[in-house]
């Protein structure tokens, strides 16, 4: 590139973000340098602060700036229900829906032997220990409806077989307002298998 090494370094650094290629990184860098210097300074400070201060909650593995996150600190959330998700963004989506009032465990991934991700890399033993220690009565497996997410859910369920815990899986199916002609076969199959009486 025909720019300063500092500009090149900024562009390369921005490329670490998901979905950001060379051109997008250049546009971002040029915007920050041309018109957004105060925003760029705030962004740099916030990044430094977050990278230094954000850790994983000791209880659920979600992002937190304290040993125990705000959700795990609330006694009313420890109601015997534990929801297992793959990522903090999944937890956030459930929280924003506003209906679930239990606690969480964030795997920070899913099983993927091809990528070298086994049970120990995503904290399965920590999850199983927590389930037993806290007397969880219902475990909601809210992993994504992908091959890896399904495999992860089945692995966890198999490990807890015979433990007298209700193990549930989030329903999969047709989105509200969706049309059958646009739904993929995998989703349609799950919708048929998870159908319920109309009276419910």
From Swiss-Prot:
GO terms for biological process: DNA recombination; DNA repair. It comes from the Bacteria. A zinc finger (C4-type) spans 57-72. InterPro entries: DNA_Rcmb_RecR, Rcmb_RecR, Rcmb_RecR_Znf, TOPRIM_dom, TOPRIM_RecR. Keywords: DNA damage, DNA recombination, DNA repair, Metal-binding, Zinc, Zinc-finger. SUPFAM superfamilies: Recombination protein RecR. GO terms for molecular function: DNA binding; zinc ion binding. Residues 80-175 form the Toprim domain. It holds the Pfam family RecR_HhH. May play a role in DNA repair. It seems to be involved in an RecBC-independent recombinational process of DNA repair. It may act with RecF and RecO. HAMAP family: RecR. Belongs to the RecR family. This is Recombination protein RecR.
